[in-house]
Amino acid sequence: MPQLIPFYFMNQLTYGLLLITVLLILFSQFFLPMILRLYVSRLFISKL
């Protein structure tokens, strides 16, 4: 059914953008501060 092809692509685009925003929020709120804290603590320990 060729009538449904644009809706399929819009659906895919919507869920793709939603997934990207959720991943971006998760990384910026949780994972990146943990990695940064680990890096800073390693730097601090190596300076001692």
Curated annotation (Swiss-Prot):
<dbReference type="GO" id="GO:0046933">
    <property type="term" value="F:proton-transporting ATP synthase activity, rotational mechanism"/>
</dbReference>
<keyword id="KW-0496">Mitochondrion</keyword>
<dbReference type="InterPro" id="IPR009230">
    <property type="entry name" value="ATP_synth_su8_fun"/>
</dbReference>
<keyword id="KW-1133">Transmembrane helix</keyword>
<keyword id="KW-0472">Membrane</keyword>
<keyword id="KW-0813">Transport</keyword>
<dbReference type="GO" id="GO:0005743">
    <property type="term" value="C:mitochondrial inner membrane"/>
</dbReference>
<comment type="subunit">
    <text>F-type ATPases have 2 components, CF(1) - the catalytic core - and CF(0) - the membrane proton channel.</text>
</comment>
<dbReference type="GO" id="GO:0015986">
    <property type="term" value="P:proton motive force-driven ATP synthesis"/>
</dbReference>
<keyword id="KW-0406">Ion transport</keyword>
<dbReference type="GO" id="GO:0045259">
    <property type="term" value="C:proton-transporting ATP synthase complex"/>
</dbReference>
<keyword id="KW-0138">CF(0)</keyword>
<keyword id="KW-0066">ATP synthesis</keyword>
<keyword id="KW-0812">Transmembrane</keyword>
<comment type="function">
    <text>Mitochondrial membrane ATP synthase (F(1)F(0) ATP synthase or Complex V) produces ATP from ADP in the presence of a proton gradient across the membrane which is generated by electron transport complexes of the respiratory chain. F-type ATPases consist of two structural domains, F(1) - containing the extramembraneous catalytic core and F(0) - containing the membrane proton channel, linked together by a central stalk and a peripheral stalk. During catalysis, ATP synthesis in the catalytic domain of F(1) is coupled via a rotary mechanism of the central stalk subunits to proton translocation.</text>
</comment>
<comment type="similarity">
    <text>Belongs to the ATPase protein 8 family.</text>
</comment>
<dbReference type="Pfam" id="PF05933">
    <property type="entry name" value="Fun_ATP-synt_8"/>
</dbReference>
<keyword id="KW-0375">Hydrogen ion transport</keyword>
<protein>
    <recommendedName>
        <fullName>ATP synthase protein 8</fullName>
    </recommendedName>
</protein>
<feature type="transmembrane region" description="Helical">
    <location>
        <begin position="12"/>
        <end position="32"/>
    </location>
</feature>
